[in-house]
């Protein structure tokens, strides 16, 4: 049984996956993070495990170009000594100035992963609280619905908007996703900078990884 204590361990980067053939063998449950470029995926992963330098953060949109795998330290990965869970930082989408060929490569990798990974238990789709769900986000949500991959919306950077605006934004977001078949009907609000909402997200991840 996976518990939130897992987030207090040291975590390590184990591999970057530029193409499907480089994926690790299917084993422990995987929890993936998707979102627009610079939505704060890497910062949120670092905050979740309280390790500032684990996932590389960058002011340059499109920095994450691979599926980056992170697991708790202390497991050999051999035989039965597998980590109980893996976190996967996915390439950001919606970065318009990247070369089209590169964007197409990222897109194919992400879509193939979402459709074909049996051990993927949930995707957390990160939405910048300042902007809400945009057209490109809707495209990704539609893909997840079509692939029947369970996903949950996580609002990021809530410290950048007025406190009173957060409940309203949560309700607006719920209304936008209520008819989507694969959407988990609960929206989480987080701030990596302030440490807000992290315990709730950790609990949600554990529940999803345990099959809930």
Swiss-Prot record:
* Keyword Magnesium (UniProt): yes
Annotated ranges, domain EngB-type G? 27-211
Q: Where does GTP bind?
A: 35-42, 62-66, 89-92, 156-159, 190-192
Keyword Hydrolase part of the UniProt annotation = no
- Note the Gene3D superfamilies from the entry: P-loop containing nucleotide triphosphate hydrolases
Q: Which UniProt keywords apply?
A: Cell cycle, Cell division, GTP-binding, Magnesium, Metal-binding, Nucleotide-binding, Septation
Show the disulfide pairing.
none
The biological process GO terms on file are: division septum assembly
GO cellular component labels: cytosol
- Give cofactor(s), names only: Mg(2+)
Describe the task this protein carries out: Necessary for normal cell division and for the maintenance of normal septation.
Q: Which family does it belong to?
A: Belongs to the TRAFAC class TrmE-Era-EngA-EngB-Septin-like GTPase superfamily. EngB GTPase family.
| Protein name (database record) | Probable GTP-binding protein EngB
